[in-house]
Amino acid sequence: MVHSNGAITSTILKARHADVVRKTSLHHANDLTLIDLVLNVQRLLALPSDANFVLKYKDEEGDLVTLAEDSDLLLALHTSGATLDVTVVVDSRAREAVHDVQKQVEQIKLDVGKLLGALSALDVAQIAEQSNTSVANLSAPKQSHHDNIVFQKSFEAAPPSPVPSEKAELPATIQPSVHEQFNHRPAHVEEEIPLENHYAPPPHQQIPDDLNTSFSSQPPPPIEQFGAIPPPNATIPSFPTSNAASPPVQEFAPPPPQQQQQQFQAPPPPMASHSSISSTPVQQQGFAPPQQFGGPPPSGPPSEYGGYAPPQQQQQQFGAPPPQGAPQQGFGAPPQGPPQGGPPQGSFGAPPPQQFHAPSPQSFGGPPPPVSSAPGNFAPPPQSGPPGAFAPPPSAFGAPQGPGGPGGYGPPPPGGPGAPGSYGPPQGGPGGFGPPPPGGPGAYGPPPTGFPPVGAPPPGAAGAPGGNPFARGPSATGYRQSPYQQ
């Protein structure tokens, strides 16, 4: 080292770093600092700026003395000669710490990479599962919809119900309506439906099988039904209902002329003909009201009291009249034999269906037109019956009270065949409500059990044999003209 009094001196710097040794000259005036020395060493050895190193020098004994401050550098310059030998010692502990930190960072990077890979795999799996479930959910409704379509097509392809089942239901739907119509509204059937529709086939014609089968389920009425209803009045006979669901016989209020034939039912036919009645009552009831109340549509002239004389075929359905000498059980008719004084056979068949209609205003006071002697019509009783024995009907028929009885049906004055104002049947006119009591000339047989005695017709009431005692005058006001009227 060069000593000078303020003069610049030069010092040779020898620096060592591991295997690298370098020399340089330092020009200073004994004012060199440690920082200047560190910068020169870094520049000389090409050390990085962030390098953490320590400078040490060798003294005279050969020891390495650390240069930590500027005073240490000044002492090294005074004690050493013209050459300053500096050794660069790098702090390995700090470097090792940094290296460890770097390794940890690298490990962390690897771990993060692994986690990212696992997360990506999980995300892919979840996305795949979700996609699979979504695809399954989307495909399942399509399959069910397809199944529904196939099921619907199978239903559409099924054949319709067979036609016989529909045909089998037709009688069940039609017949109750007919039955209900004739059961619940018996008085209005003739007014609502034309008379031609009520025509029932004569007894000699066979009723179709479909009607027999449709109405065969209803049992025929028992025999005890006839005569079960008590008479409303003791003066006239009451006739129970026969095979028809109609209002009770006790209702003798004066209804319209069209409804009277339902209230006054026909008397029961002879006991011998119950088999024919019980075999066909329901068929007649469901088809035509004239058949309900005693027989087919009339073929004779109209009677005075609104009835029609039944044709010859009426006896075939309700039974033929009994033989001679035997009284008829259905109406108490006398036998045909001369000792009894009754009318000839055939003049007292089954009673007409509408035999007790209320008389019309035009039917009183005049004799009826001549009638035919068709078999089955009522023959008038003889003239020599006891007067006053003609049973008058009750006053509920609507006729004014007459001198002959409560109903105004008493006998007319003797010899007056058609006196005005008389309500009884005229001379020679049929009008007897029943057979006269036995004993007189022309008396009928005793009435059956359960029927009250019936009075005899007034004198002069006999008509032509075979004539209709219930024939009414032509063109009676308030009555419908039947197409079968002769």
Curated annotation (Swiss-Prot):
Sequence ranges of Polar residues compositional bias: 235-245, 273-282
GO terms, biological process: COPII vesicle coating; endoplasmic reticulum to Golgi vesicle-mediated transport; maintenance of protein localization in organelle; negative regulation of apoptotic process; protein secretion; regulation of cell growth; regulation of cell size; regulation of multicellular organism growth
Family annotation (InterPro entries): PB1-like, PB1_dom, TFG
Tissue distribution: Expressed in intestinal, hypodermal and muscle tissues. Highly expressed in the reproductive system.
Keyword Endoplasmic reticulum applies: yes
Pfam families named among the record's database cross-references: PB1 (PF00564)
Region described as Required for interaction with sec-16A.1: spans on this chain: 1-195
Compositionally biased spans, kind Low complexity: 283-294, 302-319, 345-365
UniProt main location, coarse: endoplasmic reticulum
Region (Disordered): 197-486
Compartment annotation: Endoplasmic reticulum; Endoplasmic reticulum-Golgi intermediate compartment; Mitochondrion
Stated role: In its hexameric form, promotes the accumulation of sec-16A.1 and the COPII subunit npp-20 at endoplasmic reticulum exit sites (ERES), also known as transitional endoplasmic reticulum (tER), to positively regulate secretory cargo trafficking from the endoplasmic reticulum to the endoplasmic reticulum-Golgi intermediate compartment (ERGIC) and Golgi apparatus. Required for the assembly of proteins, such as the GTPase rab-6, at the Golgi apparatus. Plays a role in negatively regulating cell death and promoting cell and body growth.
This protein's name: Protein tfg-1
